[in-house]
Amino acid sequence: MRLARSFPDHTISREALEARYEKAIKGDDFGERYYIIEEKSSRQPIGWASLDIHRWTRRATGADIGLAIGEKDRWKQGYGTEVVRLLLDEAFEQLNLHRLTWWTFAENEASLALAKKMGFKEEGRTRESVFFDNQYHDNVILGLLRDEYDAWVSPLRRPGRSALKRGRS
């Protein structure tokens, strides 16, 4: 299985993803949190998600969010929405981050729509910044601040616990 076709730097085999996950379980890399997305009914892995935490000062203040559902027949079934909600809870409720950044190809309409649905706001574009499939692509940068998350989630506020499987507590 080839995961994350749209992320050339993150295209990864299941075996490589599992190796990264084992590294995270051992606590070898606090800054990168990788998660395996499992289909609930079959418990089969269908993708990955990540939080790449910014540690530019002593206090972690933000992270890049990433996810990919590897198989087309699993797209548009609500997995992305569910995973992003869990990542938002992890980032803001557990890690107490101030902001999240979402990077995506400009032509990835599904990713842009999901980001905006989850409250992210477009902040910029890096023109022809990624070379993939023999051509350059623009990247769109979206951001979500803690107060925007709080305003969005407050009517739905749940106890601050995460259902994501991760290596460190």
Question: Predicted segments — roles?
Answer:
Residues 34-169:
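Acyl-donor (CoA/ACP) binding surface of acyl/acetyltransferases
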Residues 12-13, 28, 153:
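A short hydrophobic/aromatic micro-motif that marks alpha-helical segments and, especially, helix-coil
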Residues 1-23:
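Conserved GNAT-fold acetyl-CoA-binding loop/helix
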Residues 25-31, 120:
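Short loop/turn motifs at secondary-structure junctions and domain boundaries
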Residues 1, 30, 39-41:
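Non-catalytic substrate-recognition and accessory regions of acyl/acetyltransferase enzymes
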